[in-house]
């Protein structure tokens, strides 16, 4: 009997780390993008939670009128927000070391920049990590392509729009009511409801919801029965089974008769590509719309009302939007300027006569 002793190959600590980072056997895949994603998202989340709970008021308009957004300063979950950095800061990069003190940094809304920059880097890395894991597993790269839609939307409202408007104070506040306020002001200043790219985005989101519900209900209604009537149909599926779990021919026949033949897919791969592509392309268009409106390439304006033969205004939906936009613009930053640009006029306008 012969015993052979072989010297074990020594692996450096760096090589062990590389193998661990790129291993697909880990419970959660880390990846090289993950080494940057994890600290940035943890930093953004931690700062957001602390600022949402305890941040002092922020001078968002740069006119020495601070706006409180945290829970400890009188807000609730709905009204609370991380308030954007001050208009006095503009587009300047404003880390903690750029301020004279921590109090000054908080007063000028420094936490907002800290959160959004780390958040954006984190979601960019998350998208890269999706590609990286797909590559390691030999999969196609479409998962990260689909994820690029919400990434582009977040980049548009947190980075591109403030750059176009000249100040991070115009970025979207990090809160529920702050998001709604951002939407109202965006409509008032850019007429986004009349922008074709926004319309395509609405079609993408609502259409995607409709198609998802239609697909799920069709599949659920055409499952191949593998159980008795007293058992859940979910028990009829075994993870990894080779057999089809639903009858696509039956679903195709039902939907083709419900509408017409060519409205129904007879190819499962083409169907699922369509379900993925429709909302993604719609959200891409919305992000492009916000990015173009950031530089004031706004939605359609129908400022000239339709008049009848006597000169009376015939009200249209465009008139409703214009009037609502002016009203919202008047209420926005009401102490930062006297009148919105839409109301500024070289000629004096007499007040309307009130019929008493």
UniProtKB/Swiss-Prot annotation:
Residues 345-356 form a propeptide. HAMAP family: PSII_PsbA_D1. Chlorophyll a ChlzD1 binds at residue 118. Cyanobacteria usually contain more than 2 copies of the psbA gene. Its EC number is 1.10.3.9. Tyr-161 forms a radical intermediate that is referred to as redox-active TyrZ, YZ or Y-Z. The record marks 161 as: Tyrosine radical intermediate. Belongs to the reaction center PufL/M/PsbA/D family. It is an enzyme of class 1 (oxidoreductase). One of its GO terms (biological process) is response to herbicide. This is Photosystem II protein D1. The keyword Transcription does not apply. NCBIfam families: psbA (TIGR01151). The record marks 344-345 as: Cleavage. The D1/D2 heterodimer binds P680, chlorophylls that are the primary electron donor of PSII, and subsequent electron acceptors. It shares a non-heme iron and each subunit binds pheophytin, quinone, additional chlorophylls, carotenoids and lipids. D1 provides most of the ligands for the Mn4-Ca-O5 cluster of the oxygen-evolving complex (OEC). There is also a Cl(-1) ion associated with D1 and D2, which is required for oxygen evolution. The PSII complex binds additional chlorophylls, carotenoids and specific lipids. GO terms for molecular function: chlorophyll binding; electron transporter, transferring electrons within the cyclic electron transport pathway of photosynthesis activity; iron ion binding; oxidoreductase activity, acting on diphenols and related substances as donors, oxygen as acceptor; oxygen evolving activity.
């Amino acid at each position: 009997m012969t015993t052979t002793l072989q010297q074990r190959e020594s692996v450096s600590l760096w090589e062990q780390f590389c193998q661990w980072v790129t291993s697909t056997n880990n419970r959660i895949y880390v990846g090289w993008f993950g080494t940057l994603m994890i600290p940035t998202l943890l930093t953004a989340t931690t700062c957001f939670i602390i600022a949402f709970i305890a941040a002092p008021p922020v001078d968002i308009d740069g006119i020495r009128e601070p706006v409180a957004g945290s829970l400890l300063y009188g807000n609730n979950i709905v009204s609370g927000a991380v308030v954007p950095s001050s208009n006095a800061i503009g587009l300047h990069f404003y880390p903690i070391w750029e301020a004279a003190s921590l109090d000054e940094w908080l007063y000028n809304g420094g936490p907002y920049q800290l959160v959004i920059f780390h958040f954006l880097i984190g979601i960019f890395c998350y998208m890269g990590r999706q590609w990286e894991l797909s590559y390691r597993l030999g999969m196609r790269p479409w998962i990260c392509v689909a994820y690029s839609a919400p990434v582009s939307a977040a980049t548009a409202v947190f980075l591109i729009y403030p750059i176009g408007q000249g100040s991070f104070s115009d970025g979207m506040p990090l809160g529920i009511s702050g998001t709604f306020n951002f939407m109202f002001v965006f409509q008032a200043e850019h007429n986004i409801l009349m922008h074709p790219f926004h319309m395509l985005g609405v079609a993408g989101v609502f259409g995607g919801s409709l198609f998802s519900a239609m697909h799920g209900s069709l599949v659920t209604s055409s499952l191949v029965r593998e159980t008795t009537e007293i058992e859940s149909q979910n028990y009829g599926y075994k993870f990894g089974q080779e057999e089809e779990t639903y009858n696509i021919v039956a679903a195709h026949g039902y939907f083709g008769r419900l509408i017409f033949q060519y409205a129904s897919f007879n190819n499962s791969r083409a169907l699922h590509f369509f379900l993925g592509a429709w909302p993604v392309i719609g959200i891409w268009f919305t992000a492009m719309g916000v990015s173009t409106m950031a530089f004031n390439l706004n939605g359609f304006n129908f400022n000239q009302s339709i008049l009848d033969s006597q000169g009376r205004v015939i009200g249209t939906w465009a008139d409703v939007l214009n009037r609502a936009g002016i009203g919202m613009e008047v209420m926005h930053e009401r102490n930062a300027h006297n009148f919105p640009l839409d109301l500024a006029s070289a000629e004096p306008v007499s007040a309307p006569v009130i019929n008493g």
